[in-house]
Amino acid sequence: HAEYFQPQNMILGIWGDFRSAEMKELVQREFGALPKGTAPRPAIPAIDEEAAAVSGVFLIEKTDVEQSFIRMGHSRGKQSDPDYYALVIMDDILGGGFSSRLFCNVRSDRGLAYSVGSSWAAGMDVPGIFLASGSTQLATTVQFINAVKEEIERICREEVTLEELDRSKKTYLNGFVFSFDSTGKIISRLMAYDYYGYPADTLEHFQEKIAQGKVPFGVRTVH
């Protein structure tokens, strides 16, 4: 803790009703004397792509349940990747809500799931995780897995429809504003962008890039 939690590795965010000049003076008075160290930010080991590409099936057997809970996915993608915005929309089309392909085709049409969806949590400095998940009856476990895999393969193989693309963009952008409905949330995200070396206007142009995203380009790099 003492080695890495030092002023040169910190970013301080302050929001509220105050005068900037007075706040700067207060911060300097309270924190200016902290001794600077020499320890850089700790390096994060790179992911072993070869090992990550090896697939596997892992089972946890329980005899006291009546449902199967399935998680399938892999490590992929950072927020700095050029196709990040396209993949955000792709994930929403695949499994982001009640109008998604997984929900409509696997749950509503085929009745194979109690719940089903997908998520893609892209990392800022390391690849994130793409995850498709859900729950089903024990007897339909294999059918559920195959149905989800079919939808993942289909969205990687075929272009999405304009209707899906437009609906997903609107849904995502309408919900986006609630992620930043307070000054604290905005400041926290700006600090994270700054800490990881993203452009200062990343958040400012986020919605614009989502609106311009073209899923067919991004889809082919996710699988």
State each model region's role.
Residues 1-30:
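Non-catalytic, conformational "gating/processing" segments within enzyme and secreted inhibitor domains
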Residues 190-202, 210:
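C-terminal, helix-dominated tail/subdomain
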Residues 1-9, 33-81, 92-143, 163-174, ...:
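Non-catalytic beta-strand/loop surface segments
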